[in-house]
Amino acid sequence: MKCLILSFAIFVVLASQATAGNVIIGGVCQDCSPPVAENVVVGGQSYRTGRPGQGTVYINSPGAYLGALDGPIRRTGAGGGGGGGAQYPDGYSGRLPGGTYLHNKDCVGCSISGGGD
């Protein structure tokens, strides 16, 4: 039974690493925990900080998710004639399509990881 529990615990840890996503913070971080991620991109500069599979954290990097950090929420339709995608307003926090987590404001005291918290 102990072996089964240990096997399950190892599986959960491996699965959580394999499903790590990206976190985008559209502002600055103040008193935040150090980012836990494979890569951290701050102001467009990339730093390799963690292990493979831990996701990527973007801080104050507008190119991280094209269109996500500009203006109000706007979704273009099939006949819209504009570029695809969606835009999210200042202050938006939540998951984007594909599992990326967007925190479109400054982070104060945030715990940041590529797992999306």
From Swiss-Prot:
Q: Name one GO biological process term.
A: response to mycotoxin
TM ranges are none
Q: What is this protein called?
A: Bomanin Bicipital 1
Q: Function of this protein?
A: Secreted immune-induced peptide induced by Toll signaling. Has a role in resistance to bacterial and fungal infections.
- Please describe the organ and tissue distribution of this protein's expression: Hemolymph (at protein level).
Whichever gene encodes this chain, its name is BomBc1
Q: Which InterPro entries would you find in this protein's record? A: Bomanin (IPR013172)
Q: Where in the cell is it found?
A: Secreted
Checking Pfam families in the record gives: DIM
Signal peptide region: 1-20
Question: What other note does the entry give for this protein?
Answer: Not induced after bacterial challenge in strains carrying a loss-of-function mutation for Toll. Constitutively expressed in Toll gain-of-function mutants.
Q: What induces it?
A: By bacterial infection (at protein level). Detected within 24 hours of infection (at protein level).
**Could you list the residue ranges forming a coiled coil in this record?**
none
| Similarity remark | Belongs to the bomanin family.
Q: State the UniProt keywords alphabetically.
A: Disulfide bond, Immunity, Innate immunity, Secreted, Signal
Cystine crosslinks: 29-32, 107-110
Annotated GO CC locations: extracellular region
